[in-house]
Amino acid sequence: MKKDYYEILGVGRSADKDEIKKAYRKLALKYHPDKNPDNKDAEDHFKEVNEAYEVLSNDDKRRRYDQFGHAGVGSSAASGGGAGAYGAGGADFSDIFSAFNDMFGGGGGGRGRGGFEDAFGGGQRRSRASAGIQGTDLKIRLKLSLEEIAKGVEKTLKIKKQVPCKECNGSGSKTGATETCPTCHGTGEVRQASKTMFGQFVNIAACPTCGGEGRIVKDRCPACYGEGIKQGEVTVKVTVPAGVQDNNYLTLRGQGNSGPRGGASGDLIVVIEEKPHEFFVRNGDDVIYSLAVSFPDLVLGTKVEVPTLDGAIKMTIPPSTQPETMLRIPGHGIGHLRGSGKGDQYVRVNVFVPKDLSATDKELLKGLRKSPGISPEAHGTGTEKSFFEKMKDIIG
């Protein structure tokens, strides 16, 4: 199973383009083949990062991926190794050149341009502007009946999640005061440079003091221990369209756990769980109902009442209906997820064979069995010669 693109880049589902670009540049630098020669794992990670960035940096592809997963973007992201080292697949060249500059040109504390940026006029270096740590995504399972799935439903759910601390308004500080991190000086990053025969390499990591925020809290709030978040309970409304299937999921952006100290909230991911049904078996947007009918009713025909997802209806069993016949009731299936209309209901007709019979019923059946009109031979069936009998006729 392919990895989730958001997990590959280490960002939440509500991440904006700048966060995605920043995560991509860090990971592209970390796993670049030139920095990890003869390292197959690093090469595979590099391809994954580029593939994820190609999809998530494109608004249309990201929308399709959020709605349909990997199936929504097909093979386009993987066709050329994503946004590979030489810009294949639609990645932003300035991101790649900036990563090369970090590796081969830019010093540990320098902010000037160099390397590929000098050669190709690369974009301006980013500056750190911390807005708190991204809250984590929250995943819940929502059980739905087939009737709810058939028509769509709105659910009101109570969920437990991390919410902003009321005592400090989510700042983590009693007074709301913060100061620049003395370790990274507000950048949120620490760099370690090393020189090799191939040039200078720079390893970039999140600052361990501030956790990558660039600022640290003064006068920590005693209610949340300076985190700015506490466990709480909220009510959310989830609108589920008709036609969803088991393990489909809906993403509610910004409805997940709140981020520490004013950080953006993660997403709420609602995974659909379809309850087993008492009567129906689902087949795509169609449903199948098994109906047991007595032998006389199969032969003579009858009208019966059958359940549907819209309530019970009357249907006709035509005379001489054979066992395992599928009778169709149009438009009584499940609403289509995409487009209008609904699937159908199929009624599988089975013959009912009683286990216990009275003496009278047995005599009636014995008399019926003697009637030549109900035997297979009378209707041209059951008299086919076997292969060996046919061979005997030919050989003589």
UniProtKB/Swiss-Prot annotation:
<feature type="zinc finger region" description="CR-type">
    <location>
        <begin position="152"/>
        <end position="233"/>
    </location>
</feature>
<dbReference type="GO" id="GO:0006260">
    <property type="term" value="P:DNA replication"/>
</dbReference>
<feature type="binding site">
    <location>
        <position position="184"/>
    </location>
    <ligand>
        <name>Zn(2+) 2</name>
    </ligand>
</feature>
<dbReference type="Pfam" id="PF01556">
    <property type="entry name" value="DnaJ_C"/>
</dbReference>
<feature type="binding site">
    <location>
        <position position="207"/>
    </location>
    <ligand>
        <name>Zn(2+) 2</name>
    </ligand>
</feature>
<feature type="binding site">
    <location>
        <position position="168"/>
    </location>
    <ligand>
        <name>Zn(2+) 1</name>
    </ligand>
</feature>
<keyword id="KW-0143">Chaperone</keyword>
<dbReference type="Pfam" id="PF00226">
    <property type="entry name" value="DnaJ"/>
</dbReference>
<dbReference type="InterPro" id="IPR008971">
    <property type="entry name" value="HSP40/DnaJ_pept-bd"/>
</dbReference>
<feature type="binding site">
    <location>
        <position position="165"/>
    </location>
    <ligand>
        <name>Zn(2+) 1</name>
    </ligand>
</feature>
<dbReference type="InterPro" id="IPR018253">
    <property type="entry name" value="DnaJ_domain_CS"/>
</dbReference>
<comment type="subunit">
    <text>Homodimer.</text>
</comment>
<dbReference type="Pfam" id="PF00684">
    <property type="entry name" value="DnaJ_CXXCXGXG"/>
</dbReference>
<feature type="repeat" description="CXXCXGXG motif">
    <location>
        <begin position="181"/>
        <end position="188"/>
    </location>
</feature>
<keyword id="KW-0346">Stress response</keyword>
<keyword id="KW-0479">Metal-binding</keyword>
<dbReference type="GO" id="GO:0051082">
    <property type="term" value="F:unfolded protein binding"/>
</dbReference>
<keyword id="KW-0862">Zinc</keyword>
<keyword id="KW-0235">DNA replication</keyword>
<dbReference type="GO" id="GO:0008270">
    <property type="term" value="F:zinc ion binding"/>
</dbReference>
<dbReference type="InterPro" id="IPR001623">
    <property type="entry name" value="DnaJ_domain"/>
</dbReference>
<dbReference type="InterPro" id="IPR036410">
    <property type="entry name" value="HSP_DnaJ_Cys-rich_dom_sf"/>
</dbReference>
<dbReference type="GO" id="GO:0005737">
    <property type="term" value="C:cytoplasm"/>
</dbReference>
<dbReference type="GO" id="GO:0005524">
    <property type="term" value="F:ATP binding"/>
</dbReference>
<keyword id="KW-0963">Cytoplasm</keyword>
<dbReference type="GO" id="GO:0031072">
    <property type="term" value="F:heat shock protein binding"/>
</dbReference>
<feature type="repeat" description="CXXCXGXG motif">
    <location>
        <begin position="207"/>
        <end position="214"/>
    </location>
</feature>
<feature type="binding site">
    <location>
        <position position="224"/>
    </location>
    <ligand>
        <name>Zn(2+) 1</name>
    </ligand>
</feature>
<comment type="similarity">
    <text>Belongs to the DnaJ family.</text>
</comment>
<dbReference type="GO" id="GO:0051085">
    <property type="term" value="P:chaperone cofactor-dependent protein refolding"/>
</dbReference>
<dbReference type="GO" id="GO:0042026">
    <property type="term" value="P:protein refolding"/>
</dbReference>
<feature type="binding site">
    <location>
        <position position="210"/>
    </location>
    <ligand>
        <name>Zn(2+) 2</name>
    </ligand>
</feature>
<feature type="binding site">
    <location>
        <position position="181"/>
    </location>
    <ligand>
        <name>Zn(2+) 2</name>
    </ligand>
</feature>
<keyword id="KW-0863">Zinc-finger</keyword>
<dbReference type="InterPro" id="IPR012724">
    <property type="entry name" value="DnaJ"/>
</dbReference>
<protein>
    <recommendedName>
        <fullName>Chaperone protein DnaJ</fullName>
    </recommendedName>
</protein>
<keyword id="KW-0677">Repeat</keyword>
<feature type="repeat" description="CXXCXGXG motif">
    <location>
        <begin position="221"/>
        <end position="228"/>
    </location>
</feature>
<feature type="repeat" description="CXXCXGXG motif">
    <location>
        <begin position="165"/>
        <end position="172"/>
    </location>
</feature>
<feature type="binding site">
    <location>
        <position position="221"/>
    </location>
    <ligand>
        <name>Zn(2+) 1</name>
    </ligand>
</feature>
<dbReference type="InterPro" id="IPR002939">
    <property type="entry name" value="DnaJ_C"/>
</dbReference>
<dbReference type="InterPro" id="IPR036869">
    <property type="entry name" value="J_dom_sf"/>
</dbReference>
